[in-house]
Amino acid sequence: MISAAGIKVYSYLNITAVADFFMEIKPGEHGRVTLRGYLAGMPDVGRLQEEAVRIMLQEDGDNREQVLFHGIIQSVHTFVENGVCQVILSALTSSIRLDQEERNRSFQKTKETYLGIMREVAGNVSGSGLSVETGVPVIQYRETDWEFCRRMAAGAGQVLYADPASPEIRLWAGLEEKGGTASFPADRYSVCVDETYYHMKSAGEGKKEFLYYRTE
C-alpha cells in the first residue's frame, strides 16, 4: 500500500512532508507528478524551475527507499495557509529535454532498425519489438526528438514510455523487465488526486487529504 506519508521528496525545496500526490505514466507522454507538500521555510522560487527532483517511496514496515520518480521541475507555487508554508510542485520526466527543439534529420539506410535510429537520436532506448528494419529511408522534419521517437515506436507497432525513475533520459517501447525501482504495471497505471484539488489549494480552499489509484 502506498501512502502520502511514505513519500519523500529530495530537491532544492526543503519539503518536510507530502500531503497530496498525483503521478501519471501514459504511453506516448512524459511521465508527470504533481504534489502538495509542507515547507520548512519559503524558498527562492526563481531558481526552482528546471531543477531536478527525486521522489522516493518508503513502503509500510520497510525502512528501505525505492525510486518512485526522478524528473525536472516545471512549476512551483508557494503559499501560506494557517501559518504553514506549503508548495504545489509539478514535474515531468527527464524525457522533456527531448521535447524542446524541433530538428531535421535523415536516415537513409533501409536496413537500419527502429531501435538503432531511436538510440542514435535519444541514446538510452530499449524494449521489445524495435529490432525491426525500417525498410525505407526515414526523415525527421520539424519534429522534436521526442515526437520523432514516438513516431518511430509507432512505426514498429509499439508505444513509447519515458522511464519515471531514471535521472537521465531513458525510453522504452513495448514490454520491459525492470528491477530496483518501485513497481507499476506498464500500461496506464496512475496514483492520483483530482487535479482540480490543486487549483482549490492554490486559491486557499481547504479539503481533506486523500490519495487514490486509477487503472485505465
Question: What is the predicted function of each stretch?
Answer:
Residues 111-114, 144:
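Short, structural beta-strand-to-alpha-helix junction motif
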Residues 29-31, 67-69, 85-87, 167-169:
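Envelope-exposed proteins and targeting segments
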Residues 77, 86, 93-95, 130-206:
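Short beta-strand-centered interaction patches in the first periplasmic/extracellular domains
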Residues 1-50, 56, 90-96, 158, ...:
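Juxtamembrane "anchor/assembly" segments of surface/extracellular structural proteins
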Residues 1-10, 40-78, 113-124:
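Short, acidic/charged, Gly/Pro-enriched secondary-structure junctions
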Residues 20, 66-72, 88, 102-104:
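Well-ordered beta-strand positions in beta-sheet-rich domains
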Residues 89-100, 104, 117-131:
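Residues forming anionic-ligand binding surfaces in small-molecule and nucleic-acid pockets
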Residues 102-111, 135-139:
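Second-shell loop/turn segments in exported
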